[in-house]
Amino acid sequence: MSYNRLGDPYGDDRDARSPIMNPSSLSNRSPSPGRPLDGYQLSDAPYGHHHHIEMPSSDRLAEQPTYSVERIPQSYGHNEAYEAQHQHYPGYEYSVDPEAHHDAYYTQPYQPTVTPGHDDYDLGQYPGHQHSYQDDEPILQPEDPFQAQNPYSDDYQEDMTIAPTPSPAPLRRWKTVKEVQLFQGNLVLDCPIAPKLLNQIPHAENGQRDEFTHMRYSAATCDPKDFFEERFTLRQKLFAKPRHTELFIVVTMYNEDDFLFARTMVGVFKNIEHMCSRTRSKTWGKDAWKKIVVCVISDGRAKINPRTRAVLAGLGCYQDGIAKQQVNGKDVTAHIYEYTTQVGMELKGNQVHLKPRSGVPVQMIFCLKEKNQKKINSHRWFFQAFGRVLDPNICVLLDAGTQPGKDSIYRLWKAFDVEPMCGGACGEIKVMLDHGKKLFNPLVAGQNFEYKLSNILDKPLESAFGFISVLPGAFSAYRYIALQNDKNGQGPLERYFLGEKMHGANAGIFTANMYLAEDRILCFEIVTKRNCRWLLQYVKSSTGETDVPDQMAEFILQRRRWLNGSFFAAVYAITHFYQLWRSDHSFIRKFMLLIETIYQTINMLFAWFGIGNFFLVFHILTTYLGDADLLGTAGKVLGVVFEWLYLATLVTCFVLSLGNRPGGSNKLYMTMVYLWVFIMIYLAFAAVFVTVRSIQEEVKDGSFTFSTLFTNSTFFSIIVSLGSTYVMWFIASIIFMDPWHMFTCFIQYILLTPTYINVLNIYAFCNTHDITWGTKGDDKAEKLPSANLKPGGKVDVNIPQDDGDLNAQYEAELMKFAQKPPKEIKTISEEERQADYYKGFRSSVVLVWVFCNFALGAVVLSSAGLDRFSDDAEAAETDRNNRAMIYMAVVLWSVAGLSIFKFLGAMWFLVVRMFRGV
């Protein structure tokens, strides 16, 4: 695609200034095999005499043998002359160094000839368009009524917002067939952006071309790992002076709506503005945006939300109608759109509004994957394909919906700048509370407390050791070089990308579950990387806000993946702790990491025995209440009732987890949550009551001292252990100057603790066979046209080209998100509804059957707490034996009676048969 200015770059004296006719003109070219020390600067003399905006020579896009989509009947920048001059090009040994290809990009301009019958449109009806067939004149003329308004003229009226307006006329030429040349078998197009957008942003004038006037489309027909070898490249490497990428930001998304996507992009744009405002920085400053590339990767063309795609089109990063299904018989695996946008965004209510010229430019790459292949595959495109081309310093990972703080990305980058051995870092993930309104939902409040506790206690502890068990994929950063594999192809990325293949029939169930938390594997591999000493750090000043589930069914499904993935990944890390010794860490650091491994092992053991530990604490505390000094008989009755309620709820959890979908049994799951809350209230009452009574007993003796409390086993076991934990939480929160969650969310978290321990853990372990990410299979996307190779190495493409068509298309995209989004209505198919009904009936029958048999055994044996009602142990034992003997006699005589009844019936049958004879 040609990035040279429109028109003849050599003016009238073509032969004298052409790099082919006059080799001396090559003195300003960029390093290449022939001239490794020369710079590269395009001639800046377009047709006619026009005034130019100042543009640094380093920001001029170098010529390249790809094709501009313009309002001319033939492709621009390449023809048979290119083939004649570069016959050797396809066959020589391809260099993996992008700088080696500048010679190929330096070509003479193409002088097109009209192909009869190629374009059936009569341009005579459009004033000023007759010159479209004259390549000696610029396409955009001052007198052209269809041209974009000059934003630098006195008559220009700046419009700070893009308001969708109806198209003033029907489409004139929606799609035109154009013939273009493949470059090294790859289809790459330069597409002009809609004049409606171009009018509102600064750009090169007088027909010149820059990164603001055209969007670059590449149809990738290869696997991500082959992107570089297949000779694909990105815009940053095509400037006269290739740009260095200091910060490479990826936003991965599945089917998030426009609001969630815009929320993330608003945060990213603010961070880029912040770095551009740091004028005293040696790295950043006014042109900091040139060192930052933002990559948006959507997982599946059929999955992307249409409103989100429309927002990308509004930014200039997407155009409908140019993507291809196949190129030269090869299936397209990803559609790559590149554009430097100057359109900002703001959120008003739940709507997205675009604001042109509202901020600094942002270099965007939008990668729309053809198929839904999960998040790890998206990261393969980011690291293996784009990362290898750009060779960035720091990579930042974001999920669509996570909003980084206004300087959070800079804070993450600063951690790497300060600590050379920092291989990865993460910030604080905050729960989006909508100014506190969402705290009225106990589930959200409980998660907010959990997140805060993790950011105050867990992450700082792990950061102090140098190994954070998980850098959340929703907001984290890595040093690109720390991720790279060694010369044998082994390393962090190799282990990380194995997870893409761990969801098929050949994957081991342990490994498949482990890769549900693939970011934990990546963290472990970075710290234990052979002959390296990378560390992981937590950056408290860097924050990112995200939504959390506000419905129990959604919450259970999310935690199923988290718990299973984290558990099996922790087992992997613990059992492979010996890999620490292959790293180049100091002995002290290895010793510290070994201590952290022991700490994580203890944590894992507590998680494994969590259900049993919680029941034992409940049983012991509620049994105390039955003492004569406490509640006496009332305590015994309450203890038995609540113990039966506890066990019944626990069994229900198992039955539902083994066969019922949370979304289809929401009422049953919510009933269990309420029962666990009720049980927790009683447990808290028991703890407080037992503690208060023990203190009262000590005071009553008259010899009470403060040290006496610690000699009281009941007080010491309950208060010192639990109280010190809660007090420690409060003190740590105050020290971190973030104590408000202790006042707004503490009670909700305590009440939901049994739900975390029982419901979530039971569902997770009962569904270890489910290794999906909670997403369904592929939907069939609309089939796209193919680009088939013709004689001469050319293909036909159908593309919108006319200004009116481009504007109408752009306005149509704006209209998609101009209206308020329709209220999302979750529908359940009849098949799912019927299946949920059958499963619910099955579970109800199983529960009734189990509870009836349990009750029978408990009553007969006086077990499950019934034995507490007798104060005389010997009498209780005698009574239990008597009841057992009576039950035994009833059962045995019942069996005998039934057998006799059957025998009599059989005899009667024989008697009747004797008289009937049949």
Swiss-Prot record:
Disulphide bridges, residue numbers: none
Induction record: Expressed moderately during sexual development as well as during the early phase of vegetative growth, but expressed weakly in old vegetative mycelia and in asexual structures. Expression is stimulated by osmostress. Expression is poritively regulated by the transcription factor abaA that binds tightly to all three AREs (AbaA response elements) in the chsC promoter region.
Outcome of gene disruption: Does not affect morphology in the asexual cycle nor growth rate. Exhibits growth defects on media supplemented with sodium dodecyl sulfate (SDS), high concentration of salts, chitin-binding dyes, or chitin synthase competitive inhibitors, when chsA is also deleted.
Reactions the enzyme catalyzes: [(1->4)-N-acetyl-beta-D-glucosaminyl](n) + UDP-N-acetyl-alpha-D-glucosamine = [(1->4)-N-acetyl-beta-D-glucosaminyl](n+1) + UDP + H(+)
CDD domains: Chitin_synth_C
InterPro entries, per database record: Chitin_synth, Chitin_synth_fun, Chitin_synth_N, Nucleotide-diphossugar_trans
One cellular-component annotation, GO: plasma membrane
Entry comment describing in which tissues the protein is expressed: Mainly expressed in hyphae and conidiphores. Relatively strongly expressed in young cleistothecia and in mature ascospores, but negligible in Huelle cells.
A GO biological-process term: cell septum assembly
Subcellular location: Cell membrane; Cell septum; Cell tip
Biased composition (Low complexity): 22-37
Keyword Transferase found: yes
Membrane topology according to the record: Multi-pass membrane protein
Residues bearing carbohydrate: 712
EC number: 2.4.1.16
Parts of the chain that traverse the membrane: 562-581, 605-625, 637-657, 672-692, 715-735, 845-865, 890-910
Residue span of region Disordered: 1-63
GO molecular function: chitin synthase activity
Pfam family, one: Chitin_synth_1
Keywords, alphabetical: Cell membrane, Cell wall biogenesis/degradation, Glycoprotein, Glycosyltransferase, Membrane, Transferase, Transmembrane, Transmembrane helix
Family statement: Belongs to the chitin synthase family. Class I subfamily.
Job of this protein: Polymerizes chitin, a structural polymer of the cell wall and septum, by transferring the sugar moiety of UDP-GlcNAc to the non-reducing end of the growing chitin polymer. ChsC and chsA share critical functions in hyphal wall integrity and differentiation. ChsA and chsC share also overlapping roles in septum formation.
Name this polypeptide is given: Chitin synthase C
Organism: Emericella nidulans (strain FGSC A4 / ATCC 38163 / CBS 112.46 / NRRL 194 / M139)
